[in-house]
Amino acid sequence: FWFFGHPEVYILILPGFGMISHIVAYYSGKNEPFGYMGMVWAMMAIGLLGFIVWAHHMYTVGMDVDTRAYFTSATMIIAIPTGVKVFSWLATLHGGAIKWETPMLWALGFIFLFTVGGLTGIILANSSLDIMLHDTYYVVAHFHYVLSMGAVFAIMGGFVHWFPLFSGYTLHSTWTKIHFGVMF
């Protein structure tokens, strides 16, 4: 199952990355995100690395120590391109005239939740700790922070940002900010 099912979770978040990059650049008054080519390479690396880390879901099935060491290392390497993305989003914000509109709040919420989820992922990448944390709410929190809430926040940010373009109607600013506050 994890051999084909695991790459899916890394591929599912890629459209969210694109939406967050657009929103952060737009509401920072920038033409493009900081380190555009680094962001492209980071997304490609995340997509490819997702195919070689699948067994980190199977540490408890009796793998030998060398195999666990490989998958621990390979899983931790994913932190590098994701760190590049988070750094680039924050660098895009730096020095910009930030417009504190609702899509930007969703994007900042995404960056925060994705970072917290990434930190929990680094801890879970360690096979020794993962065995201790197996079947706990720590694992549930990790994937909800990264994928569930990450994807939801990216989709909501994209929806609020592009809805006026697609429909010709503007969403009420106060109510959308209240909606963000309730969700966060």
Curated annotation (Swiss-Prot):
Membrane-crossing residue ranges in chain numbering: 1-27, 36-52, 65-93, 102-123, 137-166, 173-184
An example GO biological process term is: electron transport coupled proton transport
Sorted alphabetically, which keywords does the UniProt record give?
Copper, Electron transport, Heme, Iron, Magnesium, Membrane, Metal-binding, Mitochondrion, Mitochondrion inner membrane, Respiratory chain, Sodium, Translocase, Transmembrane, Transmembrane helix, Transport
Cross-link 1'-histidyl-3'-tyrosine (His-Tyr), residue numbers?
H6-Y10
What is one term from the GO cellular component aspect held by the record? Answer: respiratory chain complex IV
Residue sites binding O2 per the record = Y10
Question: What job does the chain carry out?
Answer: Component of the cytochrome c oxidase, the last enzyme in the mitochondrial electron transport chain which drives oxidative phosphorylation. The respiratory chain contains 3 multisubunit complexes succinate dehydrogenase (complex II, CII), ubiquinol-cytochrome c oxidoreductase (cytochrome b-c1 complex, complex III, CIII) and cytochrome c oxidase (complex IV, CIV), that cooperate to transfer electrons derived from NADH and succinate to molecular oxygen, creating an electrochemical gradient over the inner membrane that drives transmembrane transport and the ATP synthase.
Q: What family name appears in the similarity comment?
A: Belongs to the heme-copper respiratory oxidase family.
Write the protein's name.
Cytochrome c oxidase subunit 1
Species of the source: Polypterus sp. (Bichir)
Gene this protein is translated from: mt-co1
